[in-house]
Design a protein with these regions (language model features):
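Conserved acidic segment of CheY-like receiver
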Residues: 2-13, 17-18, 52
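Conserved Asp/Asn-Gly motif in the active-site loop of CheY-like receiver
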Residues: 31-38
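Residues at the starts of beta-strands that form the adenosine-phosphate
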Residues: 3, 30, 78
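A generic structural motif
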Residues: 25-31
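CheY-like receiver
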Residues: 41-92
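Conserved SAM-binding loop
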Residues: 6, 33, 81
Length: 92
């Protein structure tokens, strides 16, 4: 079973991702929900995950910086970055 981490400072967004996807049908489970990038990195140091779904814009440690650190911890982790912001720079 694949281990998934959700990282989003917006509780409703994180909960929406967790509850609206049939993770079991995908042979996956949510092992961590973190509300900032720093807690995500701390969780990764304790338990390896296969996929991180993360917001880009977060206080403390943004999703892009968190992704760089996560890849240093586990170069094989897959990362999906999401955002509700209309900033084209992120798409580049």
């Amino acid at each position: 079973m694949k281990k998934i981490m959700i990282v989003d400072d917006n509780y409703l967004s994180a909960e929406g991702i967790e509850k609206n996807i049939d993770w079991e049908a995908l042979n996956a489970e949510i092992v961590h929900i973190c509300y900032n990038g720093t807690s995500a990195i701390e969780a990764m140091k304790k338990e390896s995950v296969d996929l991180i779904i993360s917001d880009i814009e977060m206080p403390d440690l943004d999703g892009i910086s968190m992704s760089r650190q996560a890849l240093n911890i586990n170069p094989m982790v897959k990362i999906i970055l999401i955002s509700a912001y209309d900033k084209f720079e992120y798409a580049r």
